[in-house]
Amino acid sequence: MPMWAGGVGSPRRGMAPASTDDLFARKLRQPARPPLTPHTFEPRPVRGPLLRSGSDAGEARPPTPASPRARAHSHEEASRPAATSTRLFTDPLALLGLPAEEPEPAFPPVLEPRWFAHYDVQSLLFDWAPRSQGMGSHSEASSGTLASAEDQAASSDLLHGAPGFVCELGGEGELGLGGPASPPVPPALPNAAVSILEEPQNRTSAYSLEHADLGAGYYRKYFYGKEHQNFFGMDESLGPVAVSLRREEKEGSGGGTLHSYRVIVRTTQLRTLRGTISEDALPPGPPRGLSPRKLLEHVAPQLSPSCLRLGSASPKVPRTLLTLDEQVLSFQRKVGILYCRAGQGSEEEMYNNQEAGPAFMQFLTLLGDVVRLKGFESYRAQLDTKTDSTGTHSLYTTYQDHEIMFHVSTMLPYTPNNQQQLLRKRHIGNDIVTIVFQEPGSKPFCPTTIRSHFQHVFLVVRAHTPCTPHTTYRVAVSRTQDTPAFGPALPAGGGPFAANADFRAFLLAKALNGEQAAGHARQFHAMATRTRQQYLQDLATNEVTTTSLDSASRFGLPSLGGRRRAAPRGPGAELQAAGSLVWGVRAAPGARVAAGAQASGPEGIEVPCLLGISAEALVLVAPRDGRVVFNCACRDVLAWTFSEQQLDLYHGRGEAITLRFDGSPGQAVGEVVARLQLVSRGCETRELALPRDGQGRLGFEVDAEGFVTHVERFTFAETAGLRPGARLLRVCGQTLPSLRPEAAAQLLRSAPKVCVTVLPPDESGRPRRSFSELYTLSLQEPSRRGAPDPVQDEVQGVTLLPTTKQLLHLCLQDGGSPPGPGDLAEERTEFLHSQNSLSPRSSLSDEAPVLPNTTPDLLLATTAKPSVPSADSETPLTQDRPGSPSGSEDKGNPAPELRASFLPRTLSLRNSISRIMSEAGSGTLEDEWQAISEIASTCNTILESLSREGQPIPESGDPKGTPKSDAEPEPGNLSEKVSHLESMLRKLQEDLQKEKADRAALEEEVRSLRHNNRRLQAESESAATRLLLASKQLGSPTADLA
């Protein structure tokens, strides 16, 4: 059951029935007896360092007076809130002891100004609410989810549950929109790893780093070292604030310049407003730009302009702002490691292990490198590198640009007479993440055995069959209740993991993500807020001038006044911003129910979210707990279906989400559709109702992926507009990925009237695929990792002669081809033209964000090498279908005709034919021309395959894997690459036609020569006969004539 606040299964809090004289009602509403408060030896703080969130989605709850850190020496429990609000007596459900009906979730508010383009996710969550009395807002800190009783009581042979802690034993998945889901596969990012929205955030490793505020480098990238203005002050409601402004300009179409403003607003909350607003979205101003006051009145109307003063020109100011913004960024981490022998389980037993056993040493060797501390110059994590007072050696490693120093219990100094081993606990007890290594036979670990307020995450690792070639490990995780979940997700049962580099990467990523996630806990959130407030107060007090915001307006913002300003881009120009534009929506998974039916279950729950769409990504952020609940790249958007206040968005493999909008009907939906047309390659779907004919047939065929492979002529399907290459997204109201192929086939066979949502093919008739699908197809091509295979002997029943196969082999692999574009860059499939030639892209001006070419080559990824032909088995080329001479293609198993179709490289076809003919001296002229005819048939097969279906074409790669020279020209984008392929195919057809014409001319010339030869031979014989007769008549000897 999903853990959304206000959803089904979420108890209503903060409401209490009004007082009444009804004894039955009073008895029914009598609260449970409060638990007894035991004595504790710990001092009771005024505000506990670790306060839990108040709902499944991080809803704020009044702080409990008791410390939630329940350890072995303190058994106190969190008390109930002292006061609750009232509920009306007329609520009948309350009288029966049933939960009250939850109100419909409200649409989250969107920050003004409307067209401010946010740089990252945390900027979307920036709040102008006045600062709280304590150190930071509770809702901002409580990004973790409240653990249920089942999570706290979950136990295994590795880990025991405890109050105040969440246990992860494996199989939990990633919590997203609609509940837990399987972890995403590359190139998709986990929700917790999404940070920057304005720029592409590529997944470079199998395990992503999560909960990192990568947008903290915004000031360093766009302000530091560049001309800008800083303003500091003390706002009455917000406290100390720091504002940075910079005006940017870039070339526009027609030679003009386009201006925008980059803005950073910092308050005492840890979230910072970062982003850009176009000058077209602002009121008209002078050529040198708006004044800082006018700009802030529009961007930050909640900020009091009178409190701001211009920052000083001291070099300390930008350095302090860098430190302030990047305090959350750290690439040096320390992790503790405790050693638990067989039969052990308590803290004292683990700290008092003097020497490491063989299994522990095997684990340490896998995890990192043992380094000598004395003289060690890298990150030392508070260890002594001069006098060896903290041990002589330690464990050190690097992972994804992070330095990690491990505090290993057996490598730290051992004190014989100290049972608590304070010299060891002084380091490990201050580590946020602790790895507990268990030998086989260890007792289950319980987090309450560790007495520390800093250790928030425990990674329990147990070895199985250690010190053998078959060593494996299992992993369990225990985290404090206010620490949000983090990845990588554990497999079911926590393993097993083989002792290899993949397990090392998994464990290191888990440790880094755990420490980053623990930063959202109350204790560390309060510490970071105090530090931030001190920096802001210092800037507002000591680093300001007497120049007010009004006085600074006459200086203007930096601009090159000599350039001509571009003409306004008209309505909708603000939609072309590279950053993320925001709308308030209610989102739900896209499993559509029948009209009039009531949605139920996890997929029927609507979650209030902020919808952010940038030039690179689309995200849904739950503002209540500050989590990204859904994300996808804009290149993965397939299509959308919209009405006045609802939009169904299809992405990836055809999955769908439903978004509902507030406000004027059609306004927000129109803005979102216009934005999607600019930043994605998707299009609008079509809804078709397809009746059956008299024989009960629908008149079309689809494959397992939902692509229409054949539409019969003069059927209802053809009349409705269904065409080959279209893609079914919904069948009878259900998304295709949510249906098994058998279930989808049953619906198509049995439904009286089939209603389908169709994604039409592109303008060339090719089916549309998302980038993730293309990436997955590239990973599924085993031939890309090996040597190229020989050409198959048959293509559609045509037997190739040896000279023909030699020609194809030379065209494919000959390294002596003349110079030209790179080998791999020339091989392109026409079906990928659908990813680049959509009509909505034509409306995008030059200033619109363009997807950078930072991803693997899609065309190479979908081009497979030929496979080795099997001598004893052959795959049928096509499957028979009614009314068609050729069958539909199986997408899961590409037809051999595609695997045997090859595109020649830069080697000229005419030169190849001439060279082969010169070498094939034993063959007759007719055999040589027959070989050329077979080549023409093969090339026609290629063209027919491309025009009939958009399947990936087998890649004819270089067997030697020779890298492409940088000096060789290469098409710049997909459209150029596809155009290059089309021109190459046209040239191939022209060469074939010319060769046929040359053959016909040559045959005609041969026939003429033979005719002339026979005529000359006859004339010669006739002349010889006449000469013989003449010589006889003259008396000449015949021997001379003979």
From Swiss-Prot:
Keywords: Coiled coil, Cytoplasm, GTPase activation, Membrane, Nucleus, Phosphoprotein. Transmembrane segments: none annotated. Residues 957-967 have a biased composition (Basic and acidic residues). It is a peripheral membrane protein. Its main location: nucleus. GTPase activator for the nuclear Ras-related regulatory proteins Rap1 and Rap2 in vitro, converting them to the putatively inactive GDP-bound state. Affects cell cycle progression. Residues 972-1034 form a coiled coil. Expressed in fetal as well as in adult tissues. Expressed abundantly in the lymphoid tissues such as thymus, spleen and peripheral blood lymphocytes and also shows a significant expression in the spinal cord. Residues 687-763 form the PDZ domain. Signal peptide: none annotated. It comes from Homo sapiens (Human). GO terms for cellular component: cytoplasm; cytosol; endomembrane system; membrane; nucleus; perinuclear region of cytoplasm; protein-containing complex. Disulfide bonds: none annotated. The keyword Metal-binding does not apply. This is Signal-induced proliferation-associated protein 1. The keyword Coiled coil applies.
